[in-house]
Amino acid sequence: MSTTDDPTTANPVGLDRAGYDPSFLTVDVPLPALHTLARELPYVHFTVLLDPVRRLAALTAVNIDGSALLDLGRGDDWHLDERVPDGEQTGPEVYASNDLDRGHLVRRRDPVWGEPVVAAAANVDTFSFTNAAPQAAEFNQSRELWLGLEDQVLQYASTHRQRLTVFTAPVLLDDDAPYRGIRLPRRFFKIAAWTTSDGGSLRTAAYLLDQSPELDGVDLEAAFARAHEQGDPPPLGPYRTYQVPVRDVAEMTGFDLAQLAEADTLRPVPTIEPPDGIREGWVPLTSVDQLSF
């Protein structure tokens, strides 16, 4: 893993890092309010609300301009944010010598638009550790589906030359398992927001990625004990992906998402009784063909 804390690389001098723009769409979409203390960190075309206690992002918000996207090389220079004390962000030590991935929250390509120098800076900014969260490295069908969702968001913006705003974050719960000084989130959410073709109405769609272990009782306790003895990350389960009501994301996270919930395109579907672990109204996704805006 290559990391750098060189400010000339991670934070080019003179560049305006205005962060997320609430007026980016034709309908104003303010940064959702959270009822806990969080550091607001502006980057190029996106903002991270960092929970200094959990040392992870409580929320990320990115503006995507589909008419101005640039295709730049990936790079891999993960770096700490020099504006934040090291003890308030999750650095490389959490990802060393294990099977955890540094999962981008704001996807690398999403803020990479505009003038080349600006797009290049946005590309670098996405490799801040404040924009990462630990995820199970196992690549299965549902994780591929989640990445397919991210691809579709960007493809939609590019094809239709559309502007989108996307909110992404881990769901930070008190009972998340401890590991190397942090707690590993089990769920992640993504909310896409856009306006109708006439520009007059807001529309949203929310998705949830769940990597909770599919164990319980004695089996789960034994798995935790083995991981602790061996110094491994706590057990995580296979990824499951759902489209969910925005109001459920608000309930899980504590964010005020009233405006986004009002614009939710997901309509309730009557069910007899949802399976264990799935709330009523959640739609399990098994194919990219099910993803739509």
Regions found by a protein language model. Name each.
Residues 1-293:
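Domain-level detector for secreted/extracellular nuclease and nuclease-toxin modules, and
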